[in-house]
Amino acid sequence: MLPCMTPKLSDAAREYDVWRDMQGFAKATRRNDQSALRHLIRSAGDIRVNDCDHNILTQALHKMGETCSASSVNMHHASLSAFFRWCRIQKYIAPDEDPLMGIRYKKVGKRDRRRIPAHQFPGLLDAAKTPRERMIIALGLYLFLRSSEAVSLRLRDVDLQSGTIGVTIYKTGDYDVMPISSELDKELRRWLLHYQEQAGELHPDWFLVPAKKSVGFQEFALNPTARISRPEDIVKETLRRFGWEDTYWQGMHALRASGARAWFDELDANTVDGALRIVQTHLHHSSVTMTERYLGLTVDRAKRDRLLKGEAMFPSLQASNVTPINRTA
C-alpha cells in the first residue's frame, strides 16, 4: 500500500542520490541522474512523485529535446527510468506503475566524428599555446585519455624508466598501468623539464599537468596542487590555432578518437591480428561494437577494402593457363 503523501521530486532526488552513492555508482553517473531530474522539475514543477504521469513525462522529454540533442534526451530518459524503478522499490509509486511506459527513445542519426590524421599530429602539438597545453594535447593523441583521466594524473603515476603511466579509469573504476609510446615519452620528458624550470623540484603528489594561477596582469604561473577544471577549453583553443573554425562540440574526445583511429589504421595496414581488440583495450571500452562506432568503421568492410582494392577477386582463375574449349555437337 502506498503512503498517503509521497515526497516531492526534489526531496526524492536527494534521497535517490544518497542511495546511488551508497551503491557505488560513479560521480558522473549520479551527475547525469540529477541533471535529468532537474530537467523534469523545471518542466513539471516540484510535484509529488506519485503525481508524475505519462503526460507529464512526455512533455518533459519533449522540452528536453528543444535544448538537448537526441542522444542527450535518451540519456535523460534512461536516467529517469532508473529513478522510477527505485521509486517503485521505495513504494512511492505502485509496483505496476511506470510513467515512462510507451514513450519511445529518440532516433539518433549517425554523425561522422571529425578526426585529425596521424600526419597532422606534430602540427597540432606545435599549435599549442604553451608547454602545458601541448602536454594535454599529447595525452589525448598518444594515450587516448578522457578529460577526467588526463587531469587526474599525478607525477607519481609516471615511470619513464619502466615506460609506464598509471591511469585511473573513472568510468569503470579500474586502474591501468599503461605503456608509454616513444612519441609520448618524448613529450613527457620535454614537459617535465619545463615543469621543473617553472616550479622547482617536482613532488610526486603534484598534478602531472596542473592548473594555472594569476600572478599579475595577464601573467600566469603553474599551480601544481590544483587540477585543471576545463581541459576542453585547451583543446578548443589549440584546434582553433591549428585552423579549425567550428570547435564548439570538440574536446578531449576529438583527440582520443583521432589517436585511436590512427593507431587502428596503422595496426590494420600491417595486418596485426586483433587490431580492433588491441585498440579497444587501450580505449577501455566494454565491447568491440562500442569501439567500432567510436572509430567510425566496420571492420569487415575495412578488411574487404584492403583485400580487394586493386586486387583480383579470383586469382585462381588468373593462375590457370588453360583456355577451355566449348565443343558443339
What are these regions, as identified by a protein language model?
Residues 170-190, 203-237, 249-251:
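C-terminal catalytic core of Y-nucleophile DNA break-rejoin enzymes
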Residues 1-6, 308-329:
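C-terminal secondary-structure termini that scaffold catalytic or DNA-interacting sites
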Residues 50, 93-95, 107-123, 172-183, ...:
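DNA breakage-rejoining catalytic core of tyrosine-based enzymes
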